[in-house]
Amino acid sequence: MVDFRKFYKENANVAYTVLGYPNLQISEAFLQRLDQSPIDILELGVAYSDPIADGEIIADAAKIALDQGVDIHSVFELLARIKTKKALVFMVYYNLIFSYGLEKFVKKAKSLGICALIVPELSFEESDDLVKECEKYNIALITLVSVTTPKERVKKLVKHAKGFIYLLASIGITGTKSVEEAILQDKVKEIRSFTNLPIFVGFGIQNNQDVKRMRKVADGVIVGTSIVKYFKQENLDIIMKDIEEIFKK
């Protein structure tokens, strides 16, 4: 199983993008320049028609991608053309994986250099079949923990976790306001008592000030909605500058 610590030094810069937004050409050009960016780990969002965990901005981006005919096949074709030293993670809804075929999907993802899967609506209790395939192909199925997750459930969730722990820093959908820093610090301390895996904080991280605050709390910071907003500009040079700005030290 991949050790995500090898992709960053002090703290991980984790970004999220919707593949095919605003179009596949810009997605591909962005991925071609990924190694020149401050991003250490990139979450690749696969557009889905019912994105229950996503806020309006990401849901709208997914709809634009879908309206252009972007699907799992075009995503795979795009990734087959990409070579990068950075860690790539799929953020994908379970129905897409199930429809494609669990083993077939995981095997294909592995062949394209995907290190891990984030499946937001898949509960721990329903994950056995996918866990089995991920273990077979040495891909991490990322564990999500919320600040409101009870301690005993945290212990249960992280016991067999792989890759990293995704700590949801806000309650609800992506792009919403982050909870108080002290609450997050307590949750990180609690998680650390059960696992040595790196802990990355996401949901509600909106600007460089948020990034700097969260770096003091966890091992990495995940920026999603703000980065998806940048892509609306459809100018890759400006997008890259904005990404540099939000992740600056």
Swiss-Prot record:
Annotated family: Belongs to the TrpA family.
Official protein name in the record: Tryptophan synthase alpha chain
Record-linked InterPro entries: Aldolase_TIM, RibuloseP-bd_barrel, Trp_synthase_alpha_AS, Trp_synthase_suA
GO CC field: cytosol
Catalysed conversion reaction: (1S,2R)-1-C-(indol-3-yl)glycerol 3-phosphate + L-serine = D-glyceraldehyde 3-phosphate + L-tryptophan + H2O
EC numbers for this chain: 4.2.1.20
GO molecular function: tryptophan synthase activity
Record NCBIfam families: trpA
Highest taxon above the source species: Bacteria
Function of the protein: The alpha subunit is responsible for the aldol cleavage of indoleglycerol phosphate to indole and glyceraldehyde 3-phosphate.
Pfam families: Trp_syntA (PF00290)
Source organism: Campylobacter jejuni subsp. doylei (strain ATCC BAA-1458 / RM4099 / 269.97)
Source lineage: Bacteria, Pseudomonadati, Campylobacterota, Epsilonproteobacteria, Campylobacterales
Description of how the protein assembles with itself and partners: Tetramer of two alpha and two beta chains.
